[in-house]
């Protein structure tokens, strides 16, 4: 019996695989916001685009895939926006999986109206629903802050922020002096 237990323990220890997650690969590691940005509160979004437009709030749409290295790299920037602007904007981060099957782009109250088919895509809508920023790929957080600040009437021209990596999985947003 002891020999059986010893063999079983050895098999368990020898056949386990390490948990690997890598920001620089197009592999699925789980939701990118808790893993790479340390902020699992971003998803699911706290509001819908339709509600945000109805309430005339500035909205930031972020289209991503959990298995995209570019989306993983943008996660700390989007998390930084949430940290800085949480009570002033509606941040709506959406995976594009469900949007790929919905080809209708006629309703501007729905996110797929704005998605151009590429990821990551960051869009800023003003309180009237007009697109004020639309860019694919990596975006500088200061560029986003400048546009949001202008739309909210808040002067943040003296503030500059940077995304600093703590390790491969976590980053922080800090203000540059």
Please annotate each region the language model reported:
Residues 137-177:
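Thiol-/selenol-based redox modules, centered on thioredoxin-like
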Residues 46-50, 70-85:
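Typically the conserved alpha-helix immediately C-terminal to a functionally engaged Cys/Sec
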Residues 42, 56, 67-74, 115-118, ...:
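Solvent-exposed, acidic/flexible segments
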Residues 50-67:
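Short active-site neighborhood of thiol/selenol oxidoreductases, capturing the structured segment around
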Residues 20-48:
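N-terminal "domain-start" segment that seeds a small globular fold
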Residues 2-9:
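Sec-dependent signal peptide recognition
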Residues 79, 90-132, 141, 148-152:
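Thioredoxin-like thiol-disulfide oxidoreductase module
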